[in-house]
Amino acid sequence: MAGALWGFFSVLLLLLSGDAHSSEVPGAAAEGPGGSGVGLGDRFKIEGRAVVPGVKPQDWISAARVLVDGEEHVGFLKTDGSFVVHDIPSGSYVVEVISPAYKFDPVRVDITSKGKMRARYVNYIKTSEVVRLPYPLQMKSSGPPSYFIKRESWGWTDFLMNPMVMMMVLPLLIFVLLPKVVNTSDPDMRREMEQSMNMLNSNHELPDVSEFMTRLFSSKSSGKSSSGSSKTGKSGAGKRR
């Protein structure tokens, strides 16, 4: 009786172990390159090197990171500035080297389903323009980033180009220089200037510009005539003597 029970249990254990082995084999095949899941053959790596001209890699790589499509994949730099980002499926990715002390231009890497790599510049303005880059990537720093805008220094040009200053200076220059440039003794010219000033002076509460111009020109002409008459009078008196 004991022998029969022992034989029954041994046969049952053999059957259970066979079922477990048969259930594990298809799962392992599914995870391989030919299975339905994503295996190691469908994953690739992005390689490259980051360089800062004139600076040793040990001075800046500790705070730098390599980002692929934002923070979807993150890589770290080695002591010589090289980096490898593993476990990346096929597709198009933007690779960036982020450092608080130095700025690097991003690079787009296209990975085909067969593992062929193609690197190019990232151009957000002209997306159709393709400028090829060598692979593995050679990312060179363009200098320190500018976190602050430099304050503009004060200059005389800023003062002179101020609208308030121009509104005060230009009319003064016109009133001072215009009588010297224009022939004020010509009555026709004077009449045209008075008419143009009256057209500009539409507000009746303001002083009449034409009256001001007339007084200005008449005072000059009367001064000239009086000086001329005084000279002629003196010359006539001298002749009489």
From Swiss-Prot:
Residues 216-241 are annotated as: Disordered. Residues 218-234 have a biased composition (Low complexity). The keyword Transmembrane helix applies. Residues 23-158 are lumenal. It is a single-pass type I membrane protein. Component of the ER membrane protein complex (EMC). This is Endoplasmic reticulum membrane protein complex subunit 7.
